[in-house]
Amino acid sequence: MKINKVCFLALLYATLSIAGVSAQEITYRSPVDFPISLSGNVGEARSNHFHTGLDIRGGGVVGAPIYSVAKGYVSRIFVSPYGYGKALYVTHFDGTTAVYGHLDRFAPSIAQWVENQQYARQSFSVDLYPPRNLFTISRGQVIAYLGNSGSSGGPHLHFELRAALSMNPMNIGHSRIFSIADNVPPIVRKVHLYLQDTVLGVPIFSLAATIDAKKNSTGQYELTTPILYFEKPAYLAYDVIDYKNGSNFTMGIYSMEQKVNGTTNFRFAIDNISFTTTRYSNAFTQYNLTKQTRGDVIRAFVAPNNLLHNYMTNINDGIIMPPKKLGERLKITTTIVDDNNNSTNIEFYLARGDSRHINTIPDNNVSIVPWDRDFQYRDHAMTVDIPARSVYETQIMKFSYDGKYYRIGDKNIPLQKFIVLKTIDLIEPKLRSKALFVNSAGHGAGGEFIDGQMVLRTRNFDVYSIAYDTIKPSIAIVKPGANNTLKFKITDNLSGVASYRLTINGKWALAEYDPKTSSLVHRFKPNATPQERAIELKVVDRKRNVNIINTKQKW
């Protein structure tokens, strides 16, 4: 028996070691040396995804040192003009991985190795996986400096912690591994009532009522209209917002539980996030309303094409059926909790009765787009192919062409998958390579002329038109030599910058591109011998228009 026990423990230890998991729990330190103040937290429902980390504010400036939260090794280094920008991945000896994003620069030894790799590949953008023993990191070691790189709206550190085996981001705000001041409970601003109508024989939910919420004398929330009447299947959506102490930045909530007459019919909690399902955040919120408000409008409803694993209870998908008797009430009690366990309750009643809801969903010149089957719209001017499971629930939509504009559904309806628009257009042969689609905001949306048709693959319903990009990108030199840099401003009027190449004295030179500021920066080598240098910059847009400048600069 003892031998079997020893063998089992040895096997367990070996298994955990192979998986990179230690039985010893790690104590994580802060990645910064100042009190943490957040501009974003884990679980915020952002455009097409859940936010996966803590956004630690940098006080409006770049350059603060970033420290490794635990002992480990650098397992990945990612550099891009987009997304996390300059990002460092440190895997710890319990198997978890910390991600540090939007960095200004890496620690010198890491930065030099990355630069060597960039020159070897002749690319600013790189995705690198260093050998495990190349960069061993101590707890508290400076590994990088806080920045504003990539798709960042201001200086901050994006920090996340990913689980050992799944590599899914964990809700480190809720696990409270760092000290973050927060005794502010979530705020309920409104409650929206959606009723099920039948349009062309298809059940469709539409907004029936929006009621303001207010705090009562006990500090909890109620509706300004305490009883909502309904006579059809319904669901509720809650307009909620949350803050941290002393901050005006809005946060996502951790969990919500809705009870009907004391029985839970809907509950979710965001303990972790899966990259494979994160886009279903579009169905987690009431998409069109969330786009219009500061905060989240969270649906107490699970749409049929919503594969999020964060729902723990959803009786009848959160749909509430009206009582049989006229005037009979249902007591709704909903508890909303933030990631520091501050909670808010709201109570009100639903009762069977006339909601006075007038269905405004059009039933003429519309198409039914099912969530669970392929759909194709076709007319004399275009075809639109929408694969099954592209929309989150069956939708009623309009498709039309007026001689210039292609109306493809409604931009307030989100998409999970790509759809394909094909249009029959008589485009002059010399312009076919320059043609592209433009969306309702006037921005280039892509598209190519293929086999006699303009083809667009998109994940956005919108109104599109066809335009032509025949203008080469613009290049301007900005303050040459300032701060030991050679800086350019590169822009394109429509299709966007596709690539660039900088050479100095005929050799490829590293240049950092930041689309936010349209800047391209080459940093001089330290202790370089002052001399005149021949510079060539080539910029190509997505319609293959090319601009090349040649100049000479001395440094």
Describe the role of every protein-language-model region.
Residues 97-133, 199-223, 259-321, 498-528:
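Exoplasmic/lumenal beta-rich domain surfaces
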Residues 23-97, 104-109, 123-133, 138-139, ...:
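Surface-exposed, glycine-biased beta-strand/turn segments
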Residues 212-213, 254, 340-360, 549-555:
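Short beta-strand elements
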Residues 357-359, 364, 369-370, 392-436:
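Proteolytic processing hotspots in large secreted/extracellular or virion-associated proteins
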